[in-house]
């Protein structure tokens, strides 16, 4: 087990509600780390609708999901939060009163006084391609995310998909890989035009391969891939030599390991009391779309409100002997100093 990272608060989920919670906690002098299963900050806003307009953020008539994420990151910059992306929390163990030990699927361990679950509707899980026996190669030759690029140096990689993730990793891994083949079911891509243009230039220059078709079977033994059988658009069969496959077929929402954390659940949501949005486990809070209570509205602005009240209660756990004096950022010189505006 790796040495534990110690922090006041661990937030699970780096979407808008989790990001704004950093701001509210930071104003009250609490140190925060955030863990997210995605490879980017912003949650659903960044992953599902980065360019989609949002019209119901107070005081902002129009903003995109990406724009909101960038604004929140700028707002919390004074508090220097630490992000741990591409990691999923697997277990939460109570070790004090308050106090928790949290472990991720990457083997990282956190020790914190407070846990805030801000995981949207659960965790994003990669969609598995409908290829027989693919499970035998997962995490040895088949990967659904790139955590360390160096891991793929000198590999013969088959990247499957036609969206931004497939194109981005094709371009990013190209300098490291022995050879890259991009496979998509049609010669039409849903990625940024500039990325598609770069990819086609690499193909034209003979620096990578592009195939149109679908994987029907994998070849290899003992978890080590040696090739993939591909059915082309003309139904012709061929074999692509590869020792690594990266399928990017999008993500699906699942409750995931939240169900194993000892939290009360109601229709796959976490019930909370509305004074502080604490769960049935003292010291664990739930904000945003993951929680439920009478009158709940699944709106970003509701999650912001929940984060503000959560921080007030969290302060009592982190600083049990310190009296909390409520202050306004408009008039408090100490808060303005923390924000770097004084």
UniProtKB/Swiss-Prot annotation:
SUPFAM superfamilies: FAD/NAD(P)-binding domain
Catalysed reactions, semicolon-separated: 2 reduced [2Fe-2S]-[ferredoxin] + NADP(+) + H(+) = 2 oxidized [2Fe-2S]-[ferredoxin] + NADPH
Xref: InterPro entries: FAD/NAD-bd_sf, FAD/NAD-binding_dom, Fd--NADP_Rdtase_type_2, Ferredoxin-NADP_redctase_2
Cofactor: FAD
Single Gene Ontology MF annotation: NADP binding
E.C. numbers: 1.18.1.2
Cofactor remark from the record: Binds 1 FAD per subunit.
UniProt protein name: Ferredoxin--NADP reductase
Keyword terms: FAD, Flavoprotein, NADP, Oxidoreductase
Family: Belongs to the ferredoxin--NADP reductase type 2 family.
Subunit relationships: Homodimer.
């Amino acid at each position: 087990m790796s040495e534990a990272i110690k922090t006041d608060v661990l937030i699970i989920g780096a979407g808008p509600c989790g990001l704004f919670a950093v701001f509210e906690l930071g104003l009250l002098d609490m140190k925060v780390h955030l863990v997210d299963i995605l490879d980017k900050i912003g949650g659903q806003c960044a992953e599902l609708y980065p360019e989609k307009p949002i019209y119901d953020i107070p005081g902002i008539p129009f903003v995109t999901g990406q724009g909101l994420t960038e604004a929140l990151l700028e707002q919390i910059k004074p508090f220097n939060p630490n992000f741990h992306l591409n990691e999923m929390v697997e277990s939460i163990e109570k070790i004090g009163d308050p106090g928790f030990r949290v472990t991720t699927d990457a083997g990282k361990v956190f020790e914190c006084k407070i846990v805030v679950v801000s995981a949207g509707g659960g965790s994003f899980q990669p969609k598995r391609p409908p290829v027989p026996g693919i499970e035998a190669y997962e995490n040895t030759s088949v990967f659904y995310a790139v955590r360390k690029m160096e891991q793929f140096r000198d590999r013969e990689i088959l990247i499957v998909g036609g969206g931004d993730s497939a194109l981005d990793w094709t371009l990013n891994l190209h300098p490291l890989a022995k050879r890259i083949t991009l496979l998509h079911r049609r010669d039409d891509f849903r990625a940024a035009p500039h990325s598609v243009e770069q990819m086609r230039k690499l193909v034209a220059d003979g620096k990578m391969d592009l195939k149109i078709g679908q994987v029907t079977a994998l070849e290899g033994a003992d978890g080590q891939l040696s090739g993939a059988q591909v059915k082309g658009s003309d139904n012709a069969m061929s074999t692509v030599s590869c020792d690594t496959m990266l399928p990017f077929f999008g993500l699906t929402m699942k409750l995931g390991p939240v169900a194993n954390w000892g939290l009360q659940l109601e229709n796959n949501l976490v019930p909370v009391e509305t004074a502080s949005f604490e769960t049935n486990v003292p010291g664990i809070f739930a904000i945003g779309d993951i929680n439920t209570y009478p009158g709940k509205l699944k709106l970003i602005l509701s999650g912001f409100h929940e984060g503000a009240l959560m921080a007030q209660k969290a302060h009592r756990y982190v600083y049990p002997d310190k009296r909390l004096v409520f202050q306004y950022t408009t008039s408090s010189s100490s808060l303005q100093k923390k924000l770097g505006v004084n």
